[in-house]
Structures are given as C-alpha cells and as structure tokens.
Amino acid sequence: SRGDHLDGVLTSIDRGLAFVRKTDYQDIETVLHIQRRYVEFLRTPVTGTWSAAQALPDDLLPAPPEQAPEQTSTMLFWYWLYRGMAHFTCGEYADAQADLERAGWYAWSAPGHIHLLDYHFYSALALSRQLTPETFSADYRRSIHHHYDKIALWARINPGTFADKEALIYAEIVRLDGMNSIALEQYEKAVRLSREGGFNPINALAHELAGRFSLACGYPTASDAHF
C-alpha cells in the first residue's frame, strides 16, 4: 500500500528468506515465499489476458502440523489475502471475493497487523465492483459496511493513513446508491488524499475507478484525465 518500488520489496523479501532459513521457522518462510510470488506476479510483463489463476498455487501451503494445526492460521490468512489481492488486481472480482472470504476465516489470528487494512479494503471493493445500483441489496450493503466501518473508525484515529481508503470505499457505496455527484466528489477525495500520502497503488486505483465511473456517467474527457 505504501507504493514502495517492487524491486526494493523483492530485495527485502530475499534478505528475510536468507535469515529465516537459518532459524528453521517454516511458517514465516512460507509467508515470505507467498509475498515473493505475489511481487513476482506484479512484476511479470503481461501478454494476453492477465489472470491470477496461477499466481499463488495451492502447493505453496505445507501440510499443517498434526500437533498444533492452529499455528498455521496466520499463514493461511496471508495466503488467501494475497491470492485475493492478486485476483482483484486482474479484475477477477468474484474470485477475489471468494479468496478474501477465506482469509476472513483466519483474520482473528492477525490482530494489529496492517494487513487487516488490506483485507477489509479489498473485501469491500471486490464486492462493490460486482454490483450496480439495481443489484445493491440490503445484504450486500451490510457486507460492505462490515469492512467499511472498520476503515472509517481507523480513519478517524489516523486520517493520514486511512482516510484515502475510506473515501474510495465510500465513493463506491454512494455510487451504488445512485448519488453520482457525491460519488465523484469522494473519488476525487480519494485521489487527492492518496497522492498527498504517497500511497501510489491506492492513487492509481482511485484514478482507475474514478475514470470508469466518469465514463459511465457520460464524461469521457474527465475519464481520459484520470486514465
């Protein structure tokens, strides 16, 4: 979310792997391998259709130890989280939603981790991107608000880190409510706050969603500016 250069992230992961291999801590080594596969997926040039189907295969996960299966819960949270994020990046929103729901089964094991932000943020957006004002039911609203309310609370405590994410999810909510002018304002707010905070991936996503919405509203010039 910070927008660090992927080459630098990969170098940090490789250093972490070199250290962890000396300690024989299998779960942490697996998590680092998951992160490495995710970064490599983002770095790989695309030819043809971009899909996350093979980004994080099931064989990345070792069999859980019989004597302490609960020890793998945090690792499983990260696995399904990163797999869901990879699907989201490719626009495979239904697959992203399914994987993020599985991550939610293990979210209890990662209290205080910043990755909970990614879980709630992408869970809300993976669902909202599949919906239209006509299909936005009360059940879907509750599901999105389950994630949005968490981020809104964090944004009140630490707006510098969370307010841009709150604005982007809120833009999606009011888009689904048919309040187009407010949605445009919130997309713009998300663009501005993510730029000011240096959150480059969120800024790019905010521009993309704002551009798609502007085009759907009949504003091609504004849409082109975002893209």
Regions picked out by a protein language model, each given a short descriptive name:
Residues 2-227:
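Helix-coil-helix junctions within alpha-helical repeat/solenoid scaffolds
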